[in-house]
Structure formats: structure tokens, C-alpha cells
Amino acid sequence: MGLKIAVLAGGTFEPERSIVAANDVIAALKEAEHEPELVMVDGGLVDTLLRSQPDVAISCLRGADGESGDIQDVLEAANVPCVGSSAAVCRRAYDKAGLAEALQAYHNLTEDVTTAVTAQSLTLSRRAFGAWGAEAVLSQIESRISSGYPLCVKPASASAAQGVRRVENAEQLSEALHEALKLADRALVQQWVEGVELTVPVIGTGWNAFALPPVEIVPNAGWYDAAARATVGAVELHTPVRNASLSPSEPDAQAIRAEIERAVLEVYRALGMRDCGCIDLIWDGAQAIILEATANPNFAAEASFAQAAKAAGLTLPNLLNELAESALDA
């Protein structure tokens, strides 16, 4: 007899896409002979969970609803095991400003040579702008980030490229920071990184975790911003990444791909992620520049996670079955 699995969907961010993913998950779980139930996340969520008493939950929530750790807090309080990382780890992964520190701590602990690097960046808070006149330091930022303009401005905690801007001068920098600080308490100003944009799903926990084939993201126009992410057909996904995108030499491309996968696993382990996740990065021609980590991946059949699993020879029913069993045993 299969597990009784609550599939959480809806929420406040892209609820329609959340429901699409949930329906794909439900179909896969039924094929794996489990008993999935669609649970809409609203004011009656806890009552529904306490009444139905599922064995495991899988979150198909999008954005902060699924990634910030809040829904995991609720599930932990309700004593419902959930596929994926703990609430604390979700919060850590959601905080882009803490990524470099987490990688440094991992390096200090393991004493391994670290492959993963983050973009050079500065962090400014809403409080600094409102109470301490931080606007005045903007003229100094170009000299603090060695690459100079263009720069990338993003909220420290947001998803789906919300609030991410490319800025070319101090005037745009000020505007972008104020917009980013409407979405989060802190904002990052980073070097703008050009290269091959990739997302790499990971399965497993600790030293048993492994990377699925990297997925190459190619916008049809411009860069992979919030509009491109939200528009059907605006982006091409190549699974796995094309060798030619990494190097004209196939052996070199394979070596680069192995380096990318090592970097991804460093991030995954540094953050303490379990079961599954995705790491976004740019290969700049010399190294893997980590952009962010997602502890609650999109399980829709057409999304990068499922496509990477398929490229690795894994079916969505088998994958979700393994993840549900792992969550139950955690």
C-alpha cells in the first residue's frame, strides 16, 4: 500500500503554475501507486493537514511561499514530514547574501579546495537607506566592485528573478536598489557576470547527493529576467548543457561539466540541503559563479528538474517515490 501524500499547491505567487506542477506530481505519484491528495494552501491549511493526517507532504508552491521556509515551519509544527530541506535550511538557501559565508564555512570545515565561487558583491539594508543616509555611499560602489558597471542589483531574499536589475550607472543603481528594497529588507549589488547560464538539480543528502545533468538556459532575447521566466516560449532549455556552449573541445567541455557539478555539490552541502534542490550559476569561461540555491524545486513535468531527471534516465514517478520515502525516513 502506498503512502498518503499531501501535494501542496496554490499560494500567493504564480498559483496557476503551482497547480500545474501539483497535477503533474499527483499523476506521477499515482503511477508510483501512492495516494496523493491536492491540498490548496489557504487559511484552512492546518485544519486540513490535521484532519487528513498525510504520511508525507510535497510542496509545489512557488516563490517565497515554497522557498522561504515558512511552509516548512508549518509542516514541522504539524508533524508532517516534507520532501526537501528543513525550514532552517530553506531560510539559509533563500538568503542570497549569506551564500558566500556558507561556502567559506564549508571550506573551513572540510579543508577542501573550493570550486564554487560567488560574484563580488556588497549588501545594503532598507534600514541603512531609511535611517543612516546610505544613499550617499552609492557613488563609492563602482570603486568597491572591481568590474565596475554594469552591475546587478537584486533583493537578498526573493525568487524567480523578482527585482533583479542590470544597471549601467549611478542613477539606475539608486532606482534599482530602492525597487529591490521594496521586496526584501536587504539588497545585493554584484558584479554583472556574462556567460552560460545553467541550473543544476541535485538529488540526495550529504555525501550521497549527486548532480543531475546541467540544464542550459537560453533566453530568446535579452537575459533571463523575471519577464523571461514568466513568459511561455521566451526561453529554450537544453538538457544536458551543449558541449559547444562550454568549449569547442569535447574533452574540455566534459571536464568543465564535471567542475560545474563539483561546484554545485559544494553549495548543496554547504547549505545543508537534503532530498532535492537546484543550484543556479553562470559559467563565465573560467569558473562556476554561483547565483543562488533553491531548496524547493519546481516538479512540473516540463520544468528543468524533471527534464534533467529524464536526461539521467530517471522517471518522475520513480524520482518522487524515492523522495517521498526519503522524507518519511528522515
Model region roles, listed by residue range:
Residues 1-9, 36, 49, 92-195:
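Active-site nucleotide/adenylate-binding loops and adjacent lid/helix of ATP-dependent enzymes
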Residues 250-330:
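ATP-dependent carboxylate activation and anion-phosphoryl transfer catalytic cores
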Residues 1-98, 125-136, 322, 326:
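ATP-binding N-terminal substructure of ATP-dependent carboxylate-amine bond-forming enzymes
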